[in-house]
Protein backbone atom coordinates (compact mmCIF):
# COMPACT_ATOMS: atom_id res chain seq x y z
CA UNK A 1 0.00 0.00 0.00
CA UNK A 2 1.35 3.44 -0.89
CA UNK A 3 2.25 5.60 2.09
CA UNK A 4 -0.07 8.38 0.90
CA UNK A 5 -3.16 6.14 0.97
CA UNK A 6 -4.72 4.82 4.15
CA UNK A 7 -7.66 2.62 4.99
CA UNK A 8 -10.69 4.88 5.24
CA UNK A 9 -14.04 4.17 6.90
CA UNK A 10 -16.86 6.62 6.11
CA UNK A 11 -20.35 6.66 7.61
CA UNK A 12 -23.16 7.32 5.15
CA UNK A 13 -25.58 9.97 6.33
CA UNK A 14 -29.33 10.17 5.71
CA UNK A 15 -29.35 13.83 4.68
CA UNK A 16 -31.42 14.61 1.57
CA UNK A 17 -28.37 15.75 -0.39
CA UNK A 18 -25.27 14.49 -2.17
CA UNK A 19 -22.51 13.08 0.06
CA UNK A 20 -18.91 12.81 -1.19
CA UNK A 21 -17.26 9.59 0.01
CA UNK A 22 -13.95 9.33 -1.87
CA UNK A 23 -12.29 12.33 -3.50
CA UNK A 24 -9.84 10.54 -5.81
CA UNK A 25 -6.11 11.26 -5.82
CA UNK A 26 -4.22 11.60 -3.53
CA UNK A 27 -6.80 10.00 -1.20
CA UNK A 28 -7.04 6.96 -3.56
CA UNK A 29 -5.22 5.72 -6.65
CA UNK A 30 -8.01 7.20 -8.76
CA UNK A 31 -11.32 5.89 -7.39
CA UNK A 32 -14.04 8.42 -6.61
CA UNK A 33 -17.28 7.72 -4.81
CA UNK A 34 -20.38 9.41 -3.43
CA UNK A 35 -23.88 8.82 -2.14
CA UNK A 36 -26.63 10.22 -4.34
CA UNK A 37 -30.08 11.27 -3.10
CA UNK A 38 -32.79 11.81 -5.72
CA UNK A 39 -36.27 13.02 -4.81
CA UNK A 40 -39.26 11.51 -6.63
CA UNK A 41 -39.18 12.69 -10.26
CA UNK A 42 -35.52 13.82 -10.11
CA UNK A 43 -32.66 12.53 -12.26
CA UNK A 44 -28.91 12.72 -11.78
CA UNK A 45 -28.44 14.06 -15.32
CA UNK A 46 -27.16 12.28 -18.40
CA UNK A 47 -23.39 11.86 -18.36
CA UNK A 48 -20.68 9.56 -19.71
CA UNK A 49 -18.34 7.28 -17.82
CA UNK A 50 -15.67 8.35 -20.35
CA UNK A 51 -12.54 6.29 -19.60
CA UNK A 52 -13.88 5.04 -16.25
CA UNK A 53 -15.81 2.05 -14.97
CA UNK A 54 -18.71 2.78 -12.64
CA UNK A 55 -20.53 0.71 -10.04
CA UNK A 56 -23.93 1.75 -8.65
CA UNK A 57 -25.19 0.19 -5.40
CA UNK A 58 -28.84 1.03 -4.73
CA UNK A 59 -29.75 1.44 -1.06
CA UNK A 60 -33.37 2.65 -1.04
CA UNK A 61 -36.21 3.61 -3.36
CA UNK A 62 -36.75 2.62 -6.97
CA UNK A 63 -35.92 4.10 -10.30
CA UNK A 64 -34.79 3.57 -13.84
CA UNK A 65 -31.32 3.53 -15.38
CA UNK A 66 -31.32 4.91 -18.93
CA UNK A 67 -28.39 3.87 -21.15
CA UNK A 68 -27.99 6.45 -23.96
CA UNK A 69 -31.22 6.36 -25.97
CA UNK A 70 -31.23 2.58 -25.99
CA UNK A 71 -31.78 0.42 -22.93
CA UNK A 72 -33.67 1.02 -19.70
CA UNK A 73 -33.24 -1.01 -16.53
CA UNK A 74 -35.37 -1.02 -13.40
CA UNK A 75 -33.23 -0.34 -10.33
CA UNK A 76 -33.83 -0.02 -6.62
CA UNK A 77 -32.86 -1.22 -3.16
CA UNK A 78 -30.72 -4.34 -3.33
CA UNK A 79 -29.67 -3.88 -6.98
CA UNK A 80 -26.07 -3.41 -8.12
CA UNK A 81 -25.20 -2.13 -11.62
CA UNK A 82 -21.88 -2.17 -13.48
CA UNK A 83 -21.47 0.49 -16.19
CA UNK A 84 -18.54 0.04 -18.60
CA UNK A 85 -16.32 2.84 -19.95
CA UNK A 86 -17.66 5.20 -22.65
CA UNK A 87 -21.31 4.68 -21.61
CA UNK A 88 -23.80 7.57 -21.67
CA UNK A 89 -26.31 7.08 -18.86
CA UNK A 90 -28.78 8.70 -16.44
CA UNK A 91 -30.62 7.56 -13.30
CA UNK A 92 -34.24 8.67 -12.74
CA UNK A 93 -36.27 8.31 -9.55
CA UNK A 94 -39.55 6.80 -10.77
CA UNK A 95 -40.84 5.98 -7.29
CA UNK A 96 -42.72 7.89 -4.62
CA UNK A 97 -39.85 7.83 -2.09
CA UNK A 98 -36.25 9.08 -2.27
CA UNK A 99 -33.87 7.00 -4.38
CA UNK A 100 -30.51 6.60 -2.63
CA UNK A 101 -27.46 4.93 -4.12
CA UNK A 102 -23.68 4.86 -3.87
CA UNK A 103 -21.54 5.19 -6.97
CA UNK A 104 -17.89 4.17 -7.30
CA UNK A 105 -15.93 5.35 -10.33
CA UNK A 106 -12.42 4.14 -11.14
CA UNK A 107 -10.11 4.46 -14.14
CA UNK A 108 -10.51 1.55 -16.54
CA UNK A 109 -7.61 -0.89 -16.84
CA UNK A 110 -4.58 0.74 -18.38
CA UNK A 111 -5.70 4.26 -17.38
CA UNK A 112 -4.43 4.78 -13.85
CA UNK A 113 -4.43 8.56 -14.23
CA UNK A 114 -8.20 8.90 -13.67
Language model features with spans:
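Solvent-exposed residues in well-ordered beta-strands and their adjoining turns
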Residues: 37-39, 106
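Ligand-binding loop in jelly-roll beta-barrel domains
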Residues: 77, 85-111
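Short histidine-centered beta-strand/loop micro-motifs
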Residues: 22-25, 44-50, 67, 73-74, ...
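Conserved hydrophobic/aromatic beta-strand scaffold that supports enzyme active sites
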Residues: 33-37, 55, 72, 80-82
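A short, N-terminal "cap"/entry segment at the start of jelly-roll beta-barrel domains
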Residues: 1-32, 40, 45-46, 113-114
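A short beta-strand-loop-beta hairpin characteristic of the jelly-roll/cupin
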Residues: 49, 53-77, 87
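A structure-centric signal for secondary-structure junctions around beta-strands
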Residues: 30-32, 52, 98-99, 108
Amino acid sequence: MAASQKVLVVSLNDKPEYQRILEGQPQTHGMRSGRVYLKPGEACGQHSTKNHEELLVFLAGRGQLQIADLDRFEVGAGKVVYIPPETLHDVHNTGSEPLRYVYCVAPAAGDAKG
